[in-house]
């Protein structure tokens, strides 16, 4: 099932990203720059290791992990978090925990698009990606 997520995905729509970043405590200047970028996400698999790369004019990040195994992650906004990614009902669910807080990043495929739903407290952001040929 995870194979359906593999490939290169380009951001085409974003709703409430600034509110989500504000909820995380991201500063104004960083939010302004991050809101303007249109990142590309590349999801690859090598054996049982998944790699998720995000490339943008703002910042490039890369994480590699096994489904269901906790790992240390430094986020694009420099938070040091404990992360775990699971496959749940056809969705890739990425949970980040730090300093008594948590946020979820849920990726699902709807009508050939990758929908990323980011949740922190009451802040919910939806980002839509289309697969590149």
UniProtKB/Swiss-Prot annotation:
Entry keyword set: Acetylation, Cytoplasm, Lipid-binding, Phosphoprotein, Transport
Gene responsible for this protein: FABP3
Modified residues (Phosphothreonine): 8, 30
GO biological process terms held by the UniProt record: brown fat cell differentiation; cholesterol homeostasis; fatty acid metabolic process; intracellular lipid transport; long-chain fatty acid transport; negative regulation of cell population proliferation; phospholipid homeostasis; positive regulation of long-chain fatty acid import into cell
Function per UniProt: FABPs are thought to play a role in the intracellular transport of long-chain fatty acids and their acyl-CoA esters.
Membership in a protein family: Belongs to the calycin superfamily. Fatty-acid binding protein (FABP) family.
Annotated coiled-coil segments of the chain: none
Sequence positions that bind octadecanoate: 127-129
Binding residues annotated for hexadecanoate, in chain numbering: 127-129
Residue(s) carrying Phosphoserine: 23, 83
Residue intervals passing through the bilayer: none
Organismal lineage: Eukaryota, Metazoa, Chordata, Craniata, Vertebrata
Species per Swiss-Prot/TrEMBL record: Homo sapiens
Entry GO CC: cytosol; extracellular exosome; extracellular space; nucleus; sarcoplasm
Protein name as catalogued: Fatty acid-binding protein, heart
Record-linked SUPFAM superfamilies: Lipocalins
List of residues binding (9Z)-octadecenoate: 127-129
Positions carrying N-acetylvaline: 2
Record-linked Pfam families: Lipocalin
